[in-house]
Each structure stands twice: as C-alpha cells, then as structure tokens.
Amino acid sequence: DVESRGLGDVYKRQMRLENLIKDTQDEMYKKIKEGRDMEDAEAKKVADVVAISALKYGDLSNQASKDYVFDIDRFTSFEGDTGPYILYTIVRIKSILNKYKEQGGDLTAVKLQQPGNASEKELAMELAQFNTMIATAGEELAPHKVCAYIYDLANAFNHFYHETKILGEENEERKQGLVALLVLTRDILETCIDMLGFEAPEKM
C-alpha cells in the first residue's frame, strides 16, 4: 500500500544518509591520520566532527534550487571551498590565540587598531561585511551566502596570516591590535558555522 511504500522510501533514504556519513567519516579519518601525528581515538573523534562539517557545508554551499553531485574527495579536502578548510582556519586561529595566552597575553585586553598592510586591510574589510551578509542571507533564506562569506573570510585570513608577523611582532601595541583582529575573525567564523549547524574541533 501507499503507506508502506512511503515508509520503505524513508528507510532507504535514511540508510543512504547513514552510509554517506559513515563513508565521509572514514575518508576524513584516513586523511587526518595520513597528515598528522595523532592517536587513533583522537583522530576518530576529530574525523567525526570534521565529516559533519564536510557534509553540511558541501550541501548548504549550493543554492537550494540547484542540484549538485556529491564528490567525497572534494567535500573532504582541506583546501578550497570546503567545510574542512573552514574548520582548519578556525583551528589555526585558536592555536595562535592559545600561544598568545601562554606567553602571558590577555585576550580581553586587546583592541582593534587601524589596519597596517594590505592583507590586514583586506581582512578588516571582509569582517566589516558580516552584518550586511547576515541580514541578506536571513531575508533570502540563503545559507549558501553564509558559506560564500566564510570562505572569502577564511581566504582573507590565511592571506593575512602568511603576510603578517603576529606573535613575533615587536611593537606590543601593534601585536595586540593583530591579536584583536584574530579574536574577531574567530568569533565571526564560529558564529557562522554555528548557524550552519556544525562546530570546530580544538585541534586538527
């Protein structure tokens, strides 16, 4: 009958989803173990968290009205427009902030300053677009716009990271300004991934 056919379809879809999650978790575990010195249990825990980000980001980064092909290699890549790339960026920022605290720095005392170099200005400009992006994405019910924004923000941060001496900055006031920029970037990225329904691990 129609009801049993409907339940059968639901069951099949659920099984496909469970298999998809399992396959993605296995792929993430393999990639994490290949590139990092991490205990098996910790690698499994991190892989499970990152796999959810890979699936959710991969799905939500596409417009709801458009079909897409699931590509496990692309979705689980640590490079490009993917969930793992976003999470890796967040973990990188957290690592720098933890080192700053270990050196005696106080994250609550840092203040934003006028941007210095070009990559710093680029990052500040991306951060300044957050409120407008959230308003637009909310009005249009368009999570793909949140994904596009955090991808651009992650790119801007990583460019800034490679161009700028942060913890090695000798001018203490400027160092605090750079750290404040990192705090704001972390907070906005974490706010956005929370909206998208996933979280970042403490390390990757």
Where do the language-model regions lie?
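N-terminal low-complexity segments that are often proline-rich with Ser/Thr-Pro
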Residues: 1-3
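Non-catalytic interaction-recognition regions
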Residues: 5, 9-204
